Amino acid sequence: MRTRTLLLVIAGLLLLSQPACQQPESSSISFTVRLSEEALQGIEALGLDTPVRGRLFVIVSRDNEREPRLQTGVSGVPFWGIDVEDLRAGETVTLSGADAEVFGYPFASIDELPEGEYHVQALLSVYTTFERADGHTVSMHLNAGEGQDQWRAPGNAISDVVPIHISPGSGKVYPLALQSVIQPDHPVPPGGSLQQGNPPDTDKVKYVKIRSALLSEFWGRDMYIGANVLLPEGYETSNQSYPVLYMQGHFPGSGAPLGYSEEGEGRGRNAGLSEFWRSADSPRMIAVSFRDANPYYDTSYSVNSANLGPYGDAITQELVPYLESQFRIIPASWARVAAGGSTGGWEAVAMQVFQPDYWGGAWGWCPDPLDFNYHQIVNVYEDENAYYTESEWHKVERPNARSFDGNIRSTVRQENHLELATGSRTRSGGQWAIWEAVFGPVGKDGYPQAIWDPLTGKIDHATADYWRANFDVNHYLQSNWETMSSKLDGKLHIAAGDMDSYYLDNAVYLLDEFLNKEAQPRIDTEIQYGRRKPHCWTGYSPTGSGEDMTTAEFVRIAADHMARNAPASADKKWYR
């Protein structure tokens, strides 16, 4: 036994003494991605920072009908990402299944990808460095006129799509090269900026963009906000002034407010809107949508927040006054109402609640969570984990999205892991990221303090307390009802489908319970529920037909509301 033991020890020492080059090579799959000189020059030409800080992606797809980068999503194709620093032309970055810094979706590791034939593409999301007024320095993807979609953003570099055969465990290395840069839809004028895009004016739609002094001071560099302005029929031939319907929501790009089209009819609930807007029967109003994409998302949520800065003030103190100076707009609260769906629904309600004297009415359809006891389907105050419900023997994933018949389309974990793969430190440009950025405090590293661990879903209740104190709309109303009730009388109009795709009806029920049962004094509010209606339901037709309300019908409702609340001395030639 002693002889055998001695031989084993000697053998072990001999193995340890072998040169490093004789160690077994990794069996993990790897992609090497090189940044070409042409791509770097293209990034610089659009005014973005170099050497490049950002996030590098490799995306794979089984088909080549569209580029792989255009097939990502919660039910989309696999991709992996890694943060990069100071990347220069000619340099190469490796994404390996053996590297814990590389994280992907729906497979966390590249090595989890099944064997097969694929089409692969690389994309480099280019970040901008901000030295903010709060003392933090952060690197983020600056909006480049596309909202905040890193897969389509001008200035980001992409490779050609390459067909490959992937064999897990083979240790094979696949080379890719970033050779071109995504270009903006509309050219940047001399001395201009990619931010918020640069769409050209049309007959009735005018595009405005201004430098915001408030936001520029906060972010430490020039920041812009804009608006798409839909003018009424006859605007150019009259000297009349008009009330404004501010349509809230996601980044509109070059789209006209209300879905208006110069060419003809819109679709869905916008059908007939364009013809109605031009008709003799339409109320003569101006409609406006904001272009307020930012480093976190395609809209700012129209409020001041610790992570995004003073977007609420930038809108009401800079952008709206500028619009009122450039167009014949009635600068009065009664002539200034807001409406929107989903994100825009939360924005419209929050703007009215947090600034009740500034806005004259709000229509919030299928709004984002107005009470964080139901942050979609997560109670951030009492639940321990956002991704699962648990009992002694069972662990069940929380649903994130459903069909109107109840079938589950995705889970909270899946969408959060999708965002984590898209961007570390809340830089995904996605829905859950912007909620953390708007509702939450600044973390020690300058990025938003997470409401829960992005990998495990464990909730941070101290951060949840901050959410409640600052952005829980129902909590805010209950805490300030005595002073606010009279200012909101007749101004809140909310609609939600009782099968909302993202469970957003749950928070509406809680707000409804307070406004229509508990609140004293009671005020006039309107809350509708649509039976078996999904996201984003906007309410029933005022005709009583049981059909869904059209956009043209809503324009009439908003006009009636403003005319009814206008002072007796107001000029109402616009109303019909």
Language-model segments: residues:
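Generic low-polarity alpha-helical segments
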Residues: M1, F31-E37, L56, I494, ...
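Bacterial N-terminal signal peptides that target proteins for export
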Residues: M1-L7
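Residue-level marker of intrinsically disordered, low-complexity segments enriched
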Residues: L7-L8, E91
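Bacterial Sec-dependent signal peptides at the C-terminal "C-region" and cleavage site
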Residues: L14-S27
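Contiguous beta-strand segments within globular domains
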Residues: S26-L56, G226
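Non-catalytic cap/lid and distal C-terminal segments of serine-dependent acyl enzymes
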Residues: V60-F103, A108-R576
